Design a protein with these regions (language model features):
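Transmembrane alpha-helical insertion/packing segments
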Residues: 1-58
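Helical transmembrane-bundle signal
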Residues: 24-32, 57, 61-64, 84-91, ...
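Membrane-interface starts of transmembrane alpha-helices
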Residues: 45-52, 56, 79-86, 131-143
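Transmembrane helix-loop junctions in multipass membrane proteins, especially transporters and channels
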Residues: 36-43, 69-73, 99-104, 156-164
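Transmembrane alpha-helical segments of multi-pass membrane proteins
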Residues: 9, 14-25, 76-94
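Interfacial non-cytosolic loop connecting adjacent transmembrane helices
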Residues: 37-48, 94-138
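Canonical alpha-helical transmembrane segments
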Residues: 53-81
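Transmembrane alpha-helical segments in integral membrane proteins
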Residues: 60-71, 136-163
Length: 165
């Protein structure tokens, strides 16, 4: 059996990439599960803890994007860019369809089951901003998606430029 050896630098790089991906993702999942459970029991999602968790999620996602840029880690930025772009497109189509029930339209059912988790992680924050939760949720999703796309493109283009020098 062959042992896999990593240099210290390579181990640090892998650990940083894993941490930059796992930390915001775990905060997002925890917040979404709590918020969905909180709402399913009939409680008001604009109360303190759900809004606080939503703020924590947005801060963790933005901090993850900033740290990905600082440490030049492209994978977390690309991962979250793709996740939130898909979420933004799906949520925009869902809002444009005019349906008020996630499960009313068969086309969006599978996508919304998967992509509702990121949106629900900060939906109480959107609901606390205004009673029309669609617009703030779309804005938050768009900002997170575009910031990650920008970082991913910047890291990709700067990496190519350094390799061509």
């Amino acid at each position: 059996m062959q042992k896999i050896k990593f240099s210290r630098t390579e181990l640090k790089n892998r650990a940083a990439t894993a941490l930059l991906t796992a930390a915001p993702l775990s905060v997002m999942l925890l917040s979404a599960i709590y918020n969905l459970a909180f709402e399913s029991f009939g409680y008001d999602i604009t109360s303190g803890i759900p809004v606080l968790l939503s703020c924590l999620t947005v801060i963790a996602l933005i901090a993850g994007t900033v740290l990905a840029a600082v440490y030049k880690k492209r994978f977390p930025a690309v991962f979250f860019a793709l996740l939130f772009l898909m979420c933004f497109i799906c949520y925009a189509c869902f809002c444009a369809s005019g349906t008020t029930d996630i499960y009313a339209d068969g086309f969006f059912e599978a996508l919304m089951l998967i992509l509702s988790v990121p949106v629900w992680s900060y939906m109480p924050l959107a609901a606390a901003i205004t009673s029309q939760t669609a617009a703030p949720a779309m804005i938050i999703t768009g900002v997170i998606a575009l910031s990650n796309v920008g970082v991913a493109l910047w890291l990709t283009l700067s990496g190519r430029k350094e390799n061509n020098v």
